[in-house]
Amino acid sequence: MEYLAGNYDVIVVGAGHAGCEAALAAARMGGRTLLITLSLDNIAHMDCNPSLGGPAKGHLVREIDALGGQMGITADETSLQVRMLNTGKGPAVHALRIQSDKQAYHLHMRNAILGQENLVLHQALVERIKTEDGKVSGVVTRTGAFYAAPNVILTSGTYLRGRIIIGDTMYEGGPNGQQTAMNLSGALKELGLELGRFKTGTPPRIHRRSVDYTKFTVQPGDSVPWRYSFMPTQSMFWGRDVDKQIPCWLGYTTPETHQIIQDNIHRAPLYSGKIEGIGPRYCPSIEDKVVRFADRPTHQIFLEPEGWNSDELYMAGLSTSMPEEIQYDIIHSIPGLEKAELLRPGYAIEYDYVKPYQLSLSLEVRKIPGLFTAGQLNGTSGYEEAAAQGLLAGINAALRVQGKEPFIVRRSEGYLGVLIDDLVNKGVKEPYRLLTSRAEYRLILRQDNADLRLTPRGREIGLVKDERWAAFQKKKAAIAEINALWRGTTFSPLNEHLAEVLAGVHSAPVHGGISGEELMRRPEITINEIKQLIPQLAEYDEEALLEAGIEIKYAGYIEKQLAEIERFAKMEERMIPEEIVYDQIKGLSTEGRQRLKEVAPANMGQATRITGVTPADISVLLVYLEQKRRGGQIHAT
């Protein structure tokens, strides 16, 4: 029997990485928020790899932090190892990767939720979304509890009709054998949402004592304690020193490994027809790699620790859903793992997702006001992509409570904007992974300047609190002082110390006066050389120095990208009226008309990015809108 169990402003269903960020954001912005999860013991659980970051993903974590989110803080606090990737390339693709303690991460995030004002946590299984007059009115649990709210955020991850597959064995379940939400998919279909089916997987876990590490190559962390959070007081490694980091280990499969897989490929669910869902392109299973890259004799695998006090090793690169007995053979064929003890077998999981073309850029379902979806439910892969969507959905649900306009991040403002724009306008045919190559303005969207790009916007909506804002203002002031210092410092060509420093890095001698800024523009000159010449720079934080240096070195390229952004902004400003009827526009292609109706773009810029809409369609649409404007049927924008 259904009964009223409570009234809230925002209800979040699912406490994975998306749900946690959504609930915390909504509560921190003043919304009375309820977070419902299948299990209090699995909040923010890392069901797959025990790490965060890497190219584009690390950028996202920094953007989440810059806006006032939680992921970066929790990742720093519970880190096992830190590495800055791509340091041999340009700053646009420098990316932090943090190895995390799975259990510690879960506990730290749960404590953040339990300690958050305006946020209530509850364990239950949601089976229905209730609506009234076409708008969301709340959710109903399996036990009949009705929680009323005008805003509901679904962040159910891979739990919608989840099905675990290990060889010939298949059963209903979520990740790691958790219960799954079998009825919610049907409820969403009844609301008119179109769902799809995807697949993902995870590798086996082995006992660390059973590895012969002499046959692996150690992968230590960096000596610099890199952080995700821009908060200068953020601690790391559970309070341990940087030299106490736990290493990862690099190994390789062998021709024997590949032969075992090839001999049993008929038993692989991926090839036997047992798996219906489409899997992630950028994280293929080992059996898929062996088939697709048959000419390669080996593939890399990494043994990654899962915690300070855990005996489990995650086998990155060895994702599989082969039968369990074949998994033993595969593992034991790898040098150093001849006696490996299998703790958990790898598996594949199929699940339902919401096709994201049905969403607005605020992640609200267009046809059901007050209903938001975020995370893997929207067809993405990865903790970071999920958390970023959750943050945005939580922000917009809170703003809706306040009667304010949605918070939209443009492609030129952040990887978060690239992610959402791609999902809504291009859709997904496979689990979506964010890549630096998907961003047009990579040099603007660096990981080091995420706070300069987004923290002021987080402050405007009330998510960035006073302590973070003060740290941001201090960094901005430091950058201004650094710029003034090296612009105002001039060196004589007779300066012997200057000549010595230049010779040390094979930089050409100067023949006239030269400023610190001009020196910094030289490719071979780094912050280290400038600090030798201007000792006062040693007083400043390394992050502020790095930021100021990049802005000078790449000034020309940055100016070009800013000009491109300004030109494209004019298209973004050309609004498309909500009442437009695409069936009345002659000259549109059949596919273009269909896609424009599905996505309902808010402006011409968005329309140009919709898959299936051609340049000819855009020209037709522009002419139509101009004719309507001149006829007085559309207001000029």
UniProtKB/Swiss-Prot annotation:
Binding site for FAD: 14-19
An example Gene Ontology molecular-function term: flavin adenine dinucleotide binding
InterPro entries: FAD/NAD-bd_sf, GIDA_C_N, MnmG, MnmG-rel, MnmG-rel_CS, MnmG_C, MnmG_C_subdom, MnmG_C_subdom_sf
GO biological process, alphabetically ordered: tRNA methylation; tRNA wobble uridine modification
SMART domains per record: GIDA_assoc_3
Cytoplasm listed as a keyword: yes
Keywords tagged on the record: Cytoplasm, FAD, Flavoprotein, NAD, tRNA processing
Record-annotated membrane-spanning stretches: none
The keyword Cytoplasm belongs to this UniProt entry's keyword annotation: yes
A GO term from the CC aspect: cytosol
Principal subcellular localisation of the protein: cytoplasm
HAMAP family to which the protein is assigned, alphabetical: MnmG_GidA (MF_00129)
Oligomeric and partner information: Homodimer. Heterotetramer of two MnmE and two MnmG subunits.
Similarity field: Belongs to the MnmG family.
Listed name of the protein: tRNA uridine 5-carboxymethylaminomethyl modification enzyme MnmG
Organism of origin: Desulfitobacterium hafniense (strain DSM 10664 / DCB-2)
